Structures are given as C-alpha cells and as structure tokens.
Amino acid sequence: MAVRRLGILMHGVTGRMGANQHLARSIAAIRAEGGVLLANGDRVMPDPILVGRNEDKLAQLAKAHGLSRVSSNLEACLADRNDTVFFDAATTQMRPALLAKAIAAGKHVYCEKPVATNLEAAMAIVRQAKAAGIKHGVVQDKLFLPGLRKLKMLIDSGFLGRLLAVRGEFGYWVFEGDLQPAQRPSWNYRGEDGGGIILDMLCHWRYVLDNTFGSVTSVSCLGATHIPERIDEAGNRYKATADDAAYATFQLAGGVIAHFNSSWATRVRRDDLLTLHVDGTHGSAVAGLQDVVCQQRMATPKPVWNPDVKQSINFYQGWQPVPDTQSFDNGFKLQWEAFIRHVTAGTPYTWDLLEGAKGVQLVECALKSWKERRWIDVPELKV
C-alpha cells in the first residue's frame, strides 16, 4: 500500500465554515485517519497550505491542526506545481476571479457555493474549466446529511409511492445585534457585499430538489427584508439592503410541487432548523438534518373537520422513526473524500461546476420572479 501526497491550496478557511467544516472536520480529520483510501489499496494524504491575507491568523489555525504551511502570497502558491488542487471558501464576489486564476495555473478546483453572484460569471468559469480539462467540484453538503440520505432511501424504496408535494421550512431568528450579538456576519444582510438569503439558500434548494425529488422546471418567489436595520461586528448600525426571507414555490419534473420558506427572521417551533415534509400516494415523511419520521398509508389517521370540539387526535403519533442502519460521517468530509478520489483516481464525480451554476441560475430566476411578480421557467442549462 502506497501513500500518495496531494497538495491542496486552501483559501478562505479563516471564516467559520472554512475553519470548522472544511479544515477541522474534513481535511484535518482525513489526515488523522491516514488519508483517503483508494480502490487499489493506496491512500491519498492531503497536504494543505493555508492561504489568505493574515499570516498570523493562518499560522494559529495551522498550528491548531498540526500543520505548518501558510502563505499570504496567492500568486506564488498558484505557481507551485507541487500543489495541484485549489479550494476556495472566501466571499462569493471574489470567487469567479480566484477560480479563473487557479484554472489558468492548471489547478483542479473545488469551492463553496455559490460559484458566482450571477449566471454569466458562473458559466464563464464552467467553460474555462472544461476547456482546461481540469477536475472541478462544488460543495453540495446537504445531500450528505443523514436526514437527507435516509429520506432518499425511503423515496427510492417506493415507500412513499408517487410523490405529490414537498414543503421545506428553513431558518431561525438571527439577532439584530442590540439585545444579543448577531450569530451571522453582517455582510449577509448587505446586498452590495453579496448578501441575501435567496442567493445563499436557493443554491442549496436547487441541488436538493434536483437530486431528491425531480428537476426544477419553474419558480415563483417572493423575497422580503423583514429587519431593515442591524448592528455590525463593530457595534455600528447599518441598513440591511439584502433580503432576509424568501417564500418560493417550485414546479418539478414529474408534476411534484415544492414550497420552501427560508427566513432569518423566524422563531423555530419544529423538529429542526431545516425540515422537509414530503407527501406521496402511499406514505409521507418528515426529514430533519439528522432524523426522519414516516407514516404509511394504512397508518394514516382519518380526521373530520369539527372546530367546535377539541381535537382528539394527536397528529404527532402514528409516525415511525427511520432507523440508523449505518454510521453517517460528516457530509463535508464525505464530499471532500469523493473529490480527492476523483482527482487522484478518476472516479466519477457528479457535483461539478455546472451543477453549481444551476444553483445560481435558480437564484436569478427567483429574483426575476420577485421583481416581475410572476412565474419564471427554468430552462435546461448546458455548456
């Protein structure tokens, strides 16, 4: 068994998502396990160099994970042929230019979503990557959540029958910054800085819908800025110029209807921060991030509408938990392992830049729907 080194430029990992999910729980965890196992018995050991503007902060982060390589010189890192993969988790506005530089330098690229703030920029990167012949991927982490994987198993088994509708509820109350500090960065609420829940979350909903229930064919969306003013990290008040809630209905191939409420201005009274209620002809299921409950046709209660008496049926009963039939690793780590195998062994990899561009396409269609107050068709996206 041979151990093969894979040099990875990790850009933008000083932020919460980059540091926690991509560095600590993915790359560092993979290294601690001895690398990624390939089909031939070899292992691939990722050797990251942390790249960013603040070398002191990068050095502290590297030390915490037993790493030594850091740099603030991106150009020099891109020129180093010993590191063949470029990863970006910095701001969306910077991403297209960074990916373009990395592809031009011959690097394979992997990045957070959204790929870009607009479809034109996203497709330009897709075309550049295709012309260069490099391997490329986009984070689509929700597909790897235990709840989503168990839900997909239910659907594929035929338990739900013909799918009818999906109702998604996502979000929580993000504090304005006065009563309590906000738990999300202030740029999320400034449109000029790439903020907005439509840009953030509809990229997720596109791949969740496409891969779980059916391809999105049209969208009707209403956005809102419910909280007009917030307080930033320095204690200064600022005007919220980005949408903090989105109410979107999707038509899917096969006739399935999906509706998602996404909000950073809602208080949670449901099973999880994200729940998907799926109805089919033979059964229904409600999935959270980790757990899924289901109800089959013969166990469905038969209520009768009578507002004059207290409801006698407890509708939370009669649902069965879907058991954990396997152990579920971190979703970001699983996708990193799949991408590393794709780069080093040529294994198939579905979640590429074109799939990421589809998310940006849906965002643009949703924003157009909101602006024009009408349904917008979502055409097939081709290179």
Task: Please identify what each model-predicted range represents.
Residues D88-A89, L252, N261, G280:
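Short, well-ordered coil/turn residues at beta-beta hairpins
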Residues K142-A240, R373:
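Predominantly a Rossmann-like dinucleotide-binding segment in NAD(P)-dependent oxidoreductases
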Residues V3, I134, G161-A165, K368-V383:
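C-terminal capping/lid region of NAD(P)-dependent oxidoreductase domains
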Residues A2-H65:
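N-terminal Rossmann-like dinucleotide-binding module
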